[in-house]
Amino acid sequence: KKAGVPVVPGAVVKAEKDIDKAVKKIGLPLIAKPDNGVGAAATFKLETPEDVDHFKAEWDGHTEYFFEKFVTSSEICTFDGLVDRDGNIVFSTTFDYAYTPLDLMLYKMDNSYYVLKEMDQKLRQYGEAIVKAFGMKERFFHIEFFREGDDYIAIEYNNRPAGGFTIDVYNYAHSFDLYRGYAALVAGEPFPDSEFEPLYCLATSRRANAAYALSEEEVLAKYQHQFRVKKEMPAAFAELQGDYLYMLTTPSREEL
């Protein structure tokens, strides 16, 4: 908010007495999520007083939660990147989620997201303003936004890369090694530039126990020229996001 970026009202819940205060302040429906967490794990959507009572019954009473107004938009995008020791952004990119993290958790969908070749200027302006306001140095950042028409609403700011294998997705999209780039930055060396035009990079998952119209072999044969790598998801992410992650690149939005 201090950065001049649209946000939804929210409140931190540390004790049971804070719950009713937060509900009264923000109003239903709202989202309750751990103040320190990844994705939509342990997240609750509270629409009715009964939902609030259910949260009270399920909550361990110790984990701090953040309550925020529910936004109806189903479009979530990011402003991600890396800042150097002076706080200057040396790398930035953006990706769109095919499904919201909350829908992934509620409906056990297959996780899919894609890095874009170009970034909307307003999203870039908002993201850069947020990074400047936090004043972090020599860190990755991962900022999520709801897209509302031609505007954006900031959801959360993280002093880390996006989860899972997302750095690998960035690398395939931008044709360089962000791991080496970060090491160079920490060592005081110049951050390397990519010599190639960015590509779209799709990361999409499959579940081991789900039935699909096409087998893995058929999918990989169909997209053999776009396919880059298959990763086995760590157990911590598999239940929420799927067991296997596939990365594919293309220069064409239509093909994506």
Where do the model's predicted regions map?
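Active-site nucleotide/adenylate-binding loops and adjacent lid/helix of ATP-dependent enzymes
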Residues: K2-S73, D84-N88, Y113-Q125, A129
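Short secondary-structure junctions
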Residues: V5, G135-M136, K222-H225
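Peripheral (often C-terminal) accessory segments that flank ATP-dependent C-N-forming ligase machineries
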Residues: I19, G181-L256
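A short, glycine/Asx- and small/polar-enriched loop/turn
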Residues: I26-G27, R147-I153, L240-G242
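Short, flexible turn/loop "capping" segments at secondary-structure junctions
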Residues: P34-N36, L104, F237-G242
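Phosphate-binding core of ATP-grasp and ATP-grasp-like enzymes
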Residues: E58-E64, F70-Y113, Q121-I153, N158-I167, ...
